[in-house]
Amino acid sequence: MLFQKVVFYLVICSLIRIFVPKKITNKKKTMKKVLILMVMACAATAVMAQVKPAIPRDVALEAKVEKTLAKMTLDEKIGQMLELNLDVMGKTTVENAKVDREKVRSVLQQYGRSAQEVDAMVKLSDQEIIDKLGAFPVDIYQGETKRVWKLNEQMLDTLISKWKVGSILNAPGSSAATVDQWQKWIRLIQEKSMKYLGIPDIYGLDHNHGVTYTAGGTLFPQPINLGATFNTELAFRGAEITAYESRASNCPWVYNPVVDLSRDPRWPRVWESFGEDAIVNSKMVAAEIKGYQGDDPNHIDGFHVGTSTKHYFGYGAPWTGKDRTPAYISPQLLREKYFEPFKAAALAGTLTMMVNSASINGVPVHASYEYLTKWLKEDLQWDGFLVTDWADINNLYSREKVAKDKKDAIRIAINAGIDMSMDPYSVEFCILLKELVNEGKVSMSRIDDAVRRILRAKYRLGLFDEPNTGGKGYEKFGCDEFAKASLQAAEESEVLLKNDGILPLAKGKKILLTGPNANQMRCLHGGWSYTWQGSKAENLSEKYNTIYEALCNKYGKENIILEQGVTYNENGAYYDENAPEIDKAVAAAAQVDVIIAAIGENSYTETPGNLTDLWLSENQRNLVKELAKTGKPIILVLNEGRPRLIADIEPLAKAVVDILIPGNYGGDALANLLAGDANFSAKMPYTYPREINSLNTYDYKVSEEVGTMAGAYNYDAKVSLQWPFGYGLSYTTFEYANLKVDKSSFTADDILTVSVDVKNTGARAGKEAVLLYSSDLVASIVPDNKRLRDFTKIALQPGETKTVTFQLPAKNLAFVNAEGRWMLEEGEFVLKIGKLTQNVQCSQTKVWDTPNI
């Protein structure tokens, strides 16, 4: 109420200043104006009252923000809006460095550099190449080297005292450091910030599935695995542990969760989100934000962190499948699905959001006032701050060509609603933004709004009172309790897709383990694991078990033969493979009872993970085909971040397990599951395609699946899937019965209570993800064939029955109509759980005037 009263007062004052003359000559006319203005103000505040602030306002905290803001100079305000990379404050030296020019050539080609650039680089001296590439986490050296990074205190002084920089990010060389190193670096940064500015720095790291950049911390399965668990409690616990270990490292801000809907399997960041569905992403992001930030986003304690939900929004749908390329998304799809998880994040209280690097329908998101300010800040009353991704304001002129130069790009982005620029290597942002303010091209009110949002986040994190955390009180860093949580998440995330009676695999059998993913931690961890691309995981994960090591522990080393047949070229791009040695694997098969083929992908992320062919590599498929000729039963283990096509080898396997990217304990989890010491309970978080030109999602339009039409023309549109979204097997069986809905007829304001009985009819204990779908049978625009509306996960002992109940607001069955408005139409809907269905009737059409319902 206080907030609304303040708004009312401010609106009245502003309108009176604008419309009422300073000298009143006609009292009657003036009073009439005032009455009209009061009505207008009441209407304005009534509209605002319909949308509560995403995070409830704390009056005392807001007063502190305003007091700090009032003391700041323009230079200090602009400095708060800049985020620099830590690398610019130090220097990397490489001991025993001798450059391998073929590696340099390979690295540059992998990152898309032109032939001329590559030729010019390899002609430089060793030291010149090291100066240009040494800070990056790429291997360009002959033999063993040691990379040493040292903070330059004088440079740090200059950047904070002169340029007033308010945020720093990243790890030196994008490589993991120790807890002690993080403590030392960030404490020094905070000392300088408090000394020169009286305002703490907000330090950010990509701790995407655990403490990516802190050696010795806990890494969890990647987000795509958490999506496969359909268990929000695991998402919450993983985030809670990551927050604790981040704060132990003195890092208060993480660039996570990721809720870009992974609806295109070609995209190289599929595995960084929770999958293709909006509801799964929405429920998971709400759980993770609570785990990261705690119960009160206004007062985040020293064991929790601020979140930066990313990448707002539509980032996961590039038209070409290539990272950071344009997306073309219908208004309906954009509002109904791609926006929904970010709305959930805002309402869950995420402190910040990171913005989509690309464009939607020709408009760069960094340049869109509609998306940044209207949809997010105004419509949702979200008061966090928006940060760019890596140098993305620059891309408005260098790549997107919507600005003539950097200054113009800054003007466009800041006026659109960007609050902080991640401009990693330059302070030019400060110079140019100050010029824009002085020229009147960016208003002081826009600057104050951005800085107010940044200060608010710093106060909410408690950084003004205690800029540093870590040391005493963080003894649980990397403890067994956290390891068990990671193992449980891995066990619940690995999906059994096929089992022709071969699993569980009895002990005492001789096993051939083959394939490029058989003995590598890098593949189990994926990108954002100790380094940006995850390419150095082997050096920092010696205490964890590869698939080979885990199977040796489970079945006995004497029963496991390792002959990979195909291996990755670790000096090349993620997809590069060495010359195959399939004949060796085939020869080894003669000595065993069963073959486990661990195949899939090496680690990657972002642009280096782009692909030109969704099929699994020819070498790996040939390996399976040749092994199948031996007649020995094959178990396929897919270790991949996106669904690589395997339609030609799946029929050759007796069982298929997709472990996705399961993290530190993924190998141990697999061994437990294969042996039957744990039970499979995961379900596919995305649709697994069978064919290269049939990349459907589960909620495809009904017109995408049509048979023969009357007459001569055969429409024959078919959805061809390898495995559908939500599919996954178990060692036990579940029976659904008694699907009930408390209302057969409903209106938009109703809540439908949907219940179903689930019984474990098998001989093993198991967990089951229960999924509630709806279908709109007839609509004014082509309806989806079905939509997931809710889910939960339950544990059942053999013979046990539980009743699962969902509360489904009827308005959730609405869609965005052709005019861009939410609409619930009169007509019939089908609710479905398992194979059971119930028909319900909407008795009255409703169209909403608000952008969100």
For every predicted segment, state its role.
Residues M1-P53:
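Bacterial Sec-dependent N-terminal signal peptides
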Residues A46-A814, E825-I833, T837:
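Glycoside hydrolase catalytic-domain context in secreted enzymes
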Residues N817-E819:
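Flexible, membrane-facing loop/turn or short amphipathic-helix motifs
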Residues Q838-I853:
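Short beta-strand elements
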